[in-house]
From Swiss-Prot:
<dbReference type="InterPro" id="IPR001857">
    <property type="entry name" value="Ribosomal_bL19"/>
</dbReference>
<dbReference type="GO" id="GO:0022625">
    <property type="term" value="C:cytosolic large ribosomal subunit"/>
</dbReference>
<keyword id="KW-0689">Ribosomal protein</keyword>
<dbReference type="InterPro" id="IPR008991">
    <property type="entry name" value="Translation_prot_SH3-like_sf"/>
</dbReference>
<dbReference type="InterPro" id="IPR018257">
    <property type="entry name" value="Ribosomal_bL19_CS"/>
</dbReference>
<dbReference type="InterPro" id="IPR038657">
    <property type="entry name" value="Ribosomal_bL19_sf"/>
</dbReference>
<comment type="function">
    <text>This protein is located at the 30S-50S ribosomal subunit interface and may play a role in the structure and function of the aminoacyl-tRNA binding site.</text>
</comment>
<comment type="similarity">
    <text>Belongs to the bacterial ribosomal protein bL19 family.</text>
</comment>
<dbReference type="GO" id="GO:0003735">
    <property type="term" value="F:structural constituent of ribosome"/>
</dbReference>
<protein>
    <recommendedName>
        <fullName>Large ribosomal subunit protein bL19</fullName>
    </recommendedName>
</protein>
<keyword id="KW-0687">Ribonucleoprotein</keyword>
<dbReference type="Pfam" id="PF01245">
    <property type="entry name" value="Ribosomal_L19"/>
</dbReference>
<dbReference type="GO" id="GO:0006412">
    <property type="term" value="P:translation"/>
</dbReference>
Length: 116
């Protein structure tokens, strides 16, 4: 087995198949498993996907939300076991792959049109 085929086989076994398809502009609820000392709990992070990057095991996505008037962005590895589940709340209609322009918009200007 060549190195490339070996890497491909290991990568394929690590990919998650239970996640829904989503794109930048979609509103997600990401359920993240958090371990604090000996306790474990689920924390929900809800916001708009502003980017997806990479491929295979190293693929990541960034979710942005406004919390107490402050913009919070969190980047998650897509295939990590720390993600319990992902719910797609809304499908957004955007014409860009990276929605960095949302960082400078406030209030109603930062809304994204929904796909029906």
């Amino acid at each position: 087995m060549t190195n490339h085929k070996l890497i491909e086989a290991v990568t394929k076994s690590q990919l998650r198949t239970d996640l829904p398809s989503f794109r930048p502009g979609d509103t997600l609820r990401v359920h993240v498993r958090i371990i604090e000392g000996t306790r474990e709990r689920i924390q929900v992070f809800e916001g708009i996907v502003i980017k997806r990057r990479g491929g295979g095991v190293s693929e990541t996505f960034t979710v942005r939300k406004i919390s107490s008037g402050v913009g919070v962005e969190r980047t998650f590895p897509l295939h990590t076991p720390k993600i319990e589940k992902i719910e797609v709340k809304r499908r957004g209609k955007v014409r860009r792959a990276k929605l960095y322009y949302l960082r400078s918009l406030r209030g109603k200007a930062a809304r994204i049109q929904e796909i029906r």
